[in-house]
Design a protein with these regions (language model features):
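Conserved HGGG/HGGXW glycine-rich cap/lid loop of the alpha/beta-hydrolase fold
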Residues: 48, 54-98
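Conserved hydrolase catalytic core segment
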Residues: 124-164
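Catalytic histidine-centered segment of alpha/beta-hydrolase-like enzymes
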Residues: 275-288
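Active-site loop/oxyanion-hole signature of alpha/beta-hydrolase fold enzymes
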Residues: 45, 80, 90-134, 138, ...
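Conserved serine/cysteine hydrolase catalytic core
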Residues: 212-271
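Alpha/beta-hydrolase fold catalytic core
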Residues: 2-63, 85-86, 125, 212, ...
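Short N-terminal helix/helix-N-cap motif within the alpha/beta-hydrolase-1
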Residues: 72-80, 98-101, 137, 164, ...
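Conserved alpha/beta-hydrolase catalytic His-Asp/Glu region
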Residues: 163-169, 180-238
């Protein structure tokens, strides 16, 4: 485990992979045992039903938000560990998992509204928001909507470099294959972020599961996500938040801590060497220890 691995910038395609896929934490298993939670459904600001589960007890509350074309199941290896000491809330964002569909624009702001709706439903004013990949931007949107209730943000293989330049041309290049053949392109997209030595069944499940996502939801979310970086709205969002940010990242892409600190109140990074984008599934024990460390950095 190392801290603040700031090096040269990656190629645009590689960064997009790092920024993008994602799944915000939590589902239901550890060491083969199921950790049952209390389910709920709450309407988001636009009326879309948002499914969530509450596990365990204890403060601060962890709200775990998945990323692009994923859902709460991607965090099954975290539930038993963290629910022993925290109240853990898992969410399916609109268009994912058990939550409703039909939204015209799956924007990052609308996903932030989903998180706010769940936070209001479960209550509490000592929240730590944890977001994987795309979820890193979603939790920033949510924190803006929850003033005074959020202690800090934790990005999981997310928020590597807020200053990385993203252009409309780069975004179009990323989206075009997904528009042409979503299942095949999505499998390739996921496979590029999985290490070759990953257990075969896990690697296949991730690729098949993400490729089965609704294409209209995935494409809308990707366009919305890219727009935040093209316009600069993503970095600007963090400038509005008086919150500490910690990233727990794989070592597939470098972290530019100094770039992030230009936009964030504070930023620290924990890098797990030899892991990939789905480190919470592929290296759960190491990841859980790192997330414990990140929580300790934030918790007053």
């Amino acid at each position: 485990m190392t801290h603040e691995r700031a090096t040269t910038r990656p190629a645009p395609a590689a960064l997009f992979l790092g920024f993008f896929l994602g799944c915000v934490l939590v589902a239901a298993t550890a060491a083969g045992a199921t950790c049952a939670g209390t389910p709920g459904v709450v309407p988001s600001a636009d009326g879309t039903p948002i499914a969530y589960e509450v596990h365990g007890g204890g403060e601060p509350t962890l709200i775990l938000v998945h990323g692009w074309s994923c859902d709460a199941r991607y965090w099954r290896e975290q539930l038993a560990h963290f629910a022993a000491r925290h109240r853990v809330v898992t969410i399916d964002l609109a268009g994912h998992g058990h939550s409703g569909t039909g939204r015209e624009d799956y924007s990052m702001r609308s996903f932030g509204e989903d998180v706010r709706a769940v936070a209001d439903a479960v209550g509490g004013d000592r929240l730590i928001l944890v977001g994987h990949s795309m979820g890193g931007l979603v939790i920033a949107e949510a924190a803006r909507l929850l003033p005074g209730r959020v202690l800090g943000l934790i990005g999981v293989d997310s928020l590597h470099d807020l200053d990385f330049p993203v252009t409309e041309e780069h975004a179009a290049e990323m989206i075009a294959p997904l528009e042409a053949d979503f299942p095949a392109a999505c499998r390739q997209f996921a496979a590029a972020m999985i290490l070759p030595d990953t257990e075969a069944d896990l690697a296949e499940w991730i690729q098949a599961d993400m490729a089965a996502a609704p294409a209209e939801v995935a494409l809308s979310a990707m366009r919305g996500y890219m727009a935040q970086w093209i316009t600069g709205a993503g970095p600007a969002l963090f400038e509005e938040l008086p919150l500490p940010v910690v990233a727990v990242c794989a070592d597939l892409w470098p972290v530019d801590a100094e770039a992030n600190r230009r936009h964030m109140r504070s930023f620290e990074a924990i890098v797990l060497e030899g892991t990939d984008h789905f480190l919470m599934l592929g290296a759960p024990e190491r990841f859980n220890r790192a997330l414990d460390e990140a929580i300790a950095m934030i918790k007053p």
